[in-house]
Each structure stands twice: as structure tokens, then as C-alpha cells.
Amino acid sequence: MTEYKLVVVGAGGVGKSALTIQLIQNHFVDEYDPTIEDSYRKQVVIDGETCLLDILDTAGQEEYSAMRDQYMRTGEGLLCVFAINNSKSFADINLYREQIKRVKDSDDVPMVLVGNKCDLPTRTVDTKQAHELAKSYGIPFIETSAKTRQGVEDAFYTLVREIRQYRMKKLNSSDDGTQGCMGLPCVVM
């Protein structure tokens, strides 16, 4: 069974834990209890493949920012979550993305931009803005509601698909037959 290490990042109060718990336990947590770090595991079937999701739900509060490098380093893919009723959380996405690129030392990291709380009538982040940001990053954008479950599976499953594409790209680039160990051609005897 293939395992995928997913990390959920975003500002405090955007619903990272609510999204994760909705996926794992199928219920909505409506009280806000700031997370330091929680880990969840769930076996799911995505596109006919049984896989194990190892999800790290992270702290959004600034006082825990020193921990971010470590969990960004270990994650294969990241859900970058903002709340559609919180413009600051949307602006913060760029800071998270820059930190991810720095920690991973790469511009090519599997990510999905997630606009949470789409069930709320008080929107301050326009869907078009979010689509444009995701397009500029070259990543998918999905609106979700942890409360109604809208888009929750889609967000996590899309991230798994992004990781699969990334793995295949890495595999194909290292398996083109021209480069072997340390950049030298291989000879099988």
C-alpha cells in the first residue's frame, strides 16, 4: 500500500483541523482549539489505488513558526489553506509558499490551494483572486467547507494526485536511460 505524507498549513483559525477531522472522522468540529501539531492516518481508495494518508495538521499561530521548517521538510505535499472570509489568511499564503520553496529547495513541490469556509455568506476573498493565485503558482485551487464537507475529499485527493504526478516525473527524469549513478551512464553486465 502506498503511503502519502500530507501537511496542512495556513494561518490560525482558517479551519485546518476542521478539514482534517472532517476527512478522517466525518464530523465537524465547531469550537476553536488552536493546534500545536496533530497527526492522523487514514486508509482510502483514490483512483482505484488503496493508499494510506499520513496527515500532519499544523499550528497556524505565529509563535509556532519555528516548527514549520521541520514539518515542511518531511511532507511530500502540502494543503495551503486560507479562509474565504479572512483576507489576511489569503495574503499569508504567499509567505507559506516562499517558506515551502526555501525549505524544500525547489519551486516544484506538490501543493493545493484551499479556500475554506465557503459555506459562509461573508466572503472577503474573491474566487477569481484565488484561482489567479493558484494559476500563478501552477497548482490546483479547491473551495471547501469543513462544516458541510463540500470539497473536503476533493482537496486531499487532489493533493495525492499531485504527489503521484510529481513522483512519476521524478522517476521518469531519473530513468531515461542516459544518466546512471552520479550522472554517469550505467552498464549492466
Curated annotation (Swiss-Prot):
Gene Ontology MF term list: G protein activity; GTP binding; GTPase activity
Membrane topology per record: Lipid-anchor
Motif range (Effector region): 32-40
Modification comment: Palmitoylated by the ZDHHC9-GOLGA7 complex. Depalmitoylated by ABHD17A, ABHD17B and ABHD17C. A continuous cycle of de- and re-palmitoylation regulates rapid exchange between plasma membrane and Golgi.
Maturation propeptide residues: 187-189
Cell compartment(s), UniProt: Cell membrane; Golgi apparatus membrane
Keyword flag Repressor: no
EC number from the UniProt entry: 3.6.5.2
Catalytic activity: GTP + H2O = GDP + phosphate + H(+)
Means of activity regulation: Alternates between an inactive form bound to GDP and an active form bound to GTP. Activated by a guanine nucleotide-exchange factor (GEF) and inactivated by a GTPase-activating protein (GAP).
NCBIfam families reported in the protein's UniProt record: small_GTP
Protein name in UniProt: GTPase NRas
Organism: Pongo abelii (Sumatran orangutan)
Gene: NRAS
